[in-house]
A protein has these predicted regions:
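N-terminal "domain-start" segment that seeds a small globular fold
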Residues: 20-49
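Bacterial N-terminal signal peptides
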Residues: 5-16
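Short loop/turn microsegments at loop-to-beta-strand junctions
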Residues: 34-35, 57, 129-131
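Short active-site neighborhood of thiol/selenol oxidoreductases, capturing the structured segment around
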Residues: 48-67
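Hydrophobic beta-strand core positions in alpha/beta domains
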Residues: 58-60, 89, 133-134
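Thiol/disulfide oxidoreductase modules built on the thioredoxin-like
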Residues: 101-109, 116-164
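Non-globular targeting/processing and membrane-anchoring segments
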Residues: 166-175
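Structural microenvironment flanking redox-active thiols in thiol-disulfide oxidoreductases
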Residues: 70-106, 116-122
């Protein structure tokens, strides 16, 4: 009885977590509109995805208890340092003090938003963490990775570079 209960609890705990070997970059589902994303940051300031039109935005859904989420932090940190890209981490339903302790131990170079109710997670993801979405300069979701982004992943970088290329060409032609 105990073994069956323990196994059930472990299954429930890890059912929504995907390691890197399971991650795959895929186009945003055809016909599925890009949901709005309006949440508060850790200081309680309102934040709206629509305000970032003109930039490529990488939206990452995570939680401090999610091992693959923690493992992919260096990849997201590298992306956040690139011109023309904004990385936003959306924390799933954790208390503010938990998020603050986590970000103190793992300094993030990007904005963290709070999804207190889990509604944004439901609208943006297939229910698996981590999930990372690439939004183009017009505000349209283009790509989604379900599961941990591997440290050596070239597909996500190439997809972002392809979105940035037309912008770089326009800037070069204006000079």
């Amino acid at each position: 009885m105990f073994t069956r209960t323990a196994a059930g609890l472990l299954l429930a705990l890890f059912a929504g977590v995907a390691p890197a070997k399971d991650a795959a970059l895929r186009p945003w589902p055809a016909g599925q509109p890009t949901p709005a994303l309006q949440l508060a940051d850790l200081d309680g300031q309102a934040w709206d995805l629509a305000s970032l039109r003109g930039k490529v935005v990488v939206v990452n859904f995570w939680a401090s208890w999610c091992g693959p989420c923690v493992d992919e932090l260096p990849v997201l940190g590298r992306l956040s340092g690139r011109d023309g890209i904004v990385v936003v981490g959306v924390n799933y339903k954790e208390p503010l003090d938990t998020i603050e302790r986590f970000t103190a131990a793992h300094p993030l170079q990007y904005t963290v938003l709070r999804d207190r109710t889990g509604e944004a997670f439901k609208r943006w993801t297939p229910g698996v963490m981590p999930t990372t979405i690439v939004v183009d300069q017009t505000g349209r979701a283009r790509w989604r990775t379900v599961g941990e982004i591997p440290p050596d992943d070239t597909r996500l970088r190439a997809a972002i570079d392809a979105l940035l290329a037309p912008q770089a060409d326009r800037q070069h032609n204006q000079k």
